């Protein structure tokens, strides 16, 4: 049986969608979830008849991967990541690669990268932006960590990520240690600031100017034609144009 190019642990919606995205780009993906029923439900549902290998133990997953093994962890940030790393280390060989695709704090990622590297393995902490739909259709990705790991995951990451109009991938190496999760933190801070500004603009237009939803849609649509052009401005305009059935 062909071995998988990458393994993915954690089959919540983000994990499922990333696995489907990778498979759609021609990669064979081994998947594992703490509850085996979730694995079975995935491969008999959305993952049916796809190049996805169901694994019911971590050992089964590690044995199903080509070397150097690449394992992406899509689990809740915090203690769960540390516990999973400890479970995986005895099953892995030197130069295998662990990837944290969750929203870990960059200081935790620095600590984990140093710890994993001290065991002879490589570590990547990557920001993944775009939510559930982005995970399926193309997220923005911000990988950082062990520099030697990048060559092994670059093709996969740049295949599944979003692309700008000229085809440039929305993914590149951002630095060592916790750089990937640091960049994601800054990205989120900017995004939440933009969202607050949009909320305030909406509030002023609605309460002070008395504009209707259609009129506010026109304002946001015009803003999106100029220097304020952005995904958030666009979807705000789209929401205001939506009519409930």
Language-model-detected regions and their locations in the chain:
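Glycine- and other small-residue-rich loops at beta-strand/loop junctions that grip anionic moieties
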Residues: 11, 32, 73-74, 101-102, ...
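The beta1-alpha1 cofactor-binding region of Rossmann-like NAD(H)/NADP(H)-dependent oxidoreductases
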Residues: 36, 58, 78, 106-108
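Residue-level recognition of oxygen-bearing side chains
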Residues: 60, 70, 80, 111
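Helix-capping/helix-break motifs at membrane-protein junctions
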Residues: 66, 76-77, 146
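Glycine/threonine-rich flexible loop motifs
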Residues: 72-87
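Rossmann-fold dinucleotide-binding core
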Residues: 81-85, 99-100, 105-217, 225-245
């Amino acid at each position: 049986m062909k071995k998988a190019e990458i393994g993915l642990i954690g089959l919540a919606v983000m994990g499922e969608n990333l696995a489907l995205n990778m498979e759609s780009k021609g990669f064979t993906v081994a998947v594992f979830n703490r509850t085996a029923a979730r694995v079975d439900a995935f491969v008999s549902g959305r993952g049916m008849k796809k190049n996805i290998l169901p694994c019911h133990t971590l050992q089964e997953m590690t044995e199903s991967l080509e070397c150097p093994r690449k394992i992406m962890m899509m689990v809740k940030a915090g203690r769960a990541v540390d516990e999973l790393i400890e479970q995986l280390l005895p099953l892995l060989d030197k130069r295998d690669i662990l990837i944290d695709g969750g929203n870990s704090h960059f200081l935790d990622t620095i600590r984990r990268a140093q710890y994993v590297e001290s065991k002879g393995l490589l570590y990547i902490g990557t920001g993944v932006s775009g939510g559930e739909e982005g995970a399926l259709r193309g997220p923005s990705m911000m990988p950082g960590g062990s520099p030697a790991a990048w060559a092994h995951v670059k093709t996969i990451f740049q295949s599944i990520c979003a692309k700008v109009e000229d085809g440039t991938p929305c993914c590149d190496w951002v630095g060592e240690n916790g750089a990937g999760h640091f960049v994601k933190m800054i990205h989120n801070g900017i995004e939440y600031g933009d969202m607050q500004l949009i909320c305030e603009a909406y509030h002023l237009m609605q309460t002070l100017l008395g504009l209707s939803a259609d009129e506010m849609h026109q304002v946001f649509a015009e803003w999106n034609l100029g220097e304020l052009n952005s995904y958030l401005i666009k979807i705000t305009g789209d929401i205001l144009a939506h009519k409930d059935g």
